[in-house]
């Protein structure tokens, strides 16, 4: 961790880092980044509720791309999605393109988190705003179709929605 901070030096403003707290040393990383003034955001995570609570206790205060690249909500295991909806001490960011989150999930986020508990983002990919078709981006072919952008394996690869589109869909 110290080598990272030596390499990047001083970062102006309030930098943000996203990490999965369940990785080996993840909770120590949360503490290290918080001590250096970072906003620690939890994302791409399969963490259980106890690990997420431990990350919150160490200063993590946000969740990246809420509901995506994380273990889904289950009736026997709230996981990161249930945790994010219930914890007042953590905000979440949502991609309101209706592909990353359904209209019902967006309504659930709004109801559980309130207007101060979530941040609207677009996750716009370089092909945002372009017509349906295939585009070469980041060394791979991305396909824009029906308002979604997907990689060759069919996974979402960012969004074609711009922020004003997301505002309208919220």
Can you name each region flagged by the protein language model?
Residues 29, 33, 42, 51-170:
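Active-site-adjacent C-terminal substructures of enzyme catalytic domains
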Residues 1-42, 64:
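Extended substrate/RNA-proximal surfaces in nucleic-acid metabolism proteins
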């Amino acid at each position: 961790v110290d080598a990272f901070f030596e390499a990047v030096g001083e970062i102006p403003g309030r930098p943000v880092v996203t990490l999965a707290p369940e990785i080996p040393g993840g909770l120590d990383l949360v503490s290290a980044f918080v001590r250096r003034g970072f906003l620690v955001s939890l994302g791409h995570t399969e963490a259980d509720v106890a690990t997420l609570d431990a990350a919150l206790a160490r200063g993590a205060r946000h969740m990246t791309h809420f509901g995506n690249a994380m273990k889904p909500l289950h009736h026997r295991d709230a996981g990161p999605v249930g945790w994010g909806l219930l914890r007042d001490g953590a905000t979440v960011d949502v991609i309101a393109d209706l592909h990353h989150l359904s209209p019902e999930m967006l309504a659930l986020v709004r109801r559980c988190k309130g207007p101060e508990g979530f941040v609207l983002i677009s996750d716009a990919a370089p092909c945002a705003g372009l017509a349906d078709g295939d585009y070469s981006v980041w060394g791979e072919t991305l396909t824009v179709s029906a308002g979604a952008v997907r990689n060759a394996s069919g996974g979402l690869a960012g969004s074609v929605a711009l922020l004003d589109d997301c505002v309208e869909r919220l």
